[in-house]
Each structure stands twice: as C-alpha cells, then as structure tokens.
C-alpha cells in the first residue's frame, strides 16, 4: 500500500513547495524588481515620506474644496477587507431610494453645477474601492471646488484635464480621473487651511483607511 501512496505523497509535497512557495516568491521578486511601486501597493506619499493613500483604492471626501469620490458599498466605505458592490438590482426600491437621496444631496451641495448629476457620483462600483470618477463627474463638481478654493473655474478645469487618464492601451475602458491625485494637485496649486473631519481624512493628512 505504501508503494502506491509514495508517488502521490511525493507529488503533493513537490507541488506544495512549487506552487505554494517557489512560484509566489519568484513572482514577488520579479514584481519588486520590475515594478517596485506597483508591487508595494501604488502608495502615494507626501514629501516627508508619509503615506497618504493608494492610487488603487478610493477614499471618502466630504469637504467642499475637494472633489468627491463615487459612493462605496464596501463596509463603511472603501474598506478593502469588505470589497463589494450593493448587489441590488436596478429596480430594487432600496437602491432607487438611495440613488435619489444622493442626487438631491449632490444638487444641494453643487448649486452651480450644470446638467444632470453624472451616474458614477450616485452609484457604487462593483468592488466598492474604485479610486476614479469620470471626467464628466469631475467637471460637474468644478464650480463648487473653484468657489471653495477661491479659484477661477477654468483653472480647476485645466487641473481636471491634466489629471485625466486615457484608456488602457488606447482602447480598454474609458477615460477617468483619480480623485486622490486630483485633490493633491489642488492642494499643491491652492492649499487651504482645514481640519480633518472625524473618520474622513483629507489629502495631506497622514491617515490611510
């Protein structure tokens, strides 16, 4: 019996070492050598080295001088340990009510915005972690941000244009804007004194969720 079991046990041990140890270590080593920033989580740092967040995971912004991210259904919001969408169908009454409430809140906070509220500002992504919004969603918020910063709207629009990322490989996906990067660019152009809101760190604050 042992004669029949030995090849199977040997194969299990070999595959465990190969796929559970050697392969992950090799992939990690190659990633750290070829893509050190991405392998470390695409972290964004302040000049003093303090981590402000990741370019891959969104954050919640609520202050008027910042661009706001799309809603998140991941835990209490952008919780990577609870990545998820709402799992509610488009006709679900709870989803319809939530979207309508978001529309009204955004209109109240953006009285000078032109046109309907962009859909990505009132709907969560499938992961709940999306760090991007559409250029249209950023432009829709531009009047509010410009007023809060004391800037001309055209200057804010130019920052949006500079922060817009094109399609992957030129044809995959749609143009998008990384909200954290855009807000940091705003701080660099027109810093404003502020206090962080409890549970909602803003750019420049050394807290990552």
From Swiss-Prot:
Gene Ontology CC annotations of this record: plasma membrane
Ranges where the record places region Disordered: 188-209
InterPro entries: KdpC
Subcellular location: Cell inner membrane
Membrane topology: Single-pass membrane protein
Keyword Ribosomal protein in annotation: no
Bias kind Basic and acidic residues: ranges: 197-209
Entry function: Part of the high-affinity ATP-driven potassium transport (or Kdp) system, which catalyzes the hydrolysis of ATP coupled with the electrogenic transport of potassium into the cytoplasm. This subunit acts as a catalytic chaperone that increases the ATP-binding affinity of the ATP-hydrolyzing subunit KdpB by the formation of a transient KdpB/KdpC/ATP ternary complex.
Family: Belongs to the KdpC family.
Assembly notes: The system is composed of three essential subunits: KdpA, KdpB and KdpC.
Source organism: Rhodospirillum centenum (strain ATCC 51521 / SW)
Official protein name in the record: Potassium-transporting ATPase KdpC subunit
Recorded GO MF terms: ATP binding; P-type potassium transmembrane transporter activity
């Amino acid at each position: 019996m042992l004669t029949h079991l030995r090849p199977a046990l040997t194969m299990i041990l070999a595959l465990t070492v190969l796929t559970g140890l050697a392969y992950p270590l090799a992939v990690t080593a190659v990633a750290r050598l070829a893509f050190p920033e991405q392998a470390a989580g695409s972290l964004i740092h302040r000049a003093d080295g303090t981590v402000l967040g990741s370019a891959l995971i969104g954050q919640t912004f609520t202050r008027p001088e910042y661009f706001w991210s799309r809603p998140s259904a991941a835990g209490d919001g952008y919780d990577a340990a609870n990545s998820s969408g709402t799992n509610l169908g488009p006709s679900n009454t709870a989803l319809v009510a939530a979207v309508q409430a978001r529309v009204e809140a955004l209109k109240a906070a953006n009285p000078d915005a032109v046109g309907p509220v962009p859909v990505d500002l009132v709907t969560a992504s499938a992961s709940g972690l999306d760090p991007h919004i559409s250029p249209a969603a950023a432009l829709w918020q531009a009047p509010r941000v410009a007023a809060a910063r004391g800037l001309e709207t055209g200057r804010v629009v130019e920052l949006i244009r500079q922060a817009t990322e094109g399609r992957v490989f030129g044809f995959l996906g749609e143009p998008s804007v990384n909200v954290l990067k855009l807000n940091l660019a705003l701080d660099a152009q027109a810093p404003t004194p502020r206090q962080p809101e409890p549970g909602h760190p803003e750019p420049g604050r050394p807290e990552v969720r």
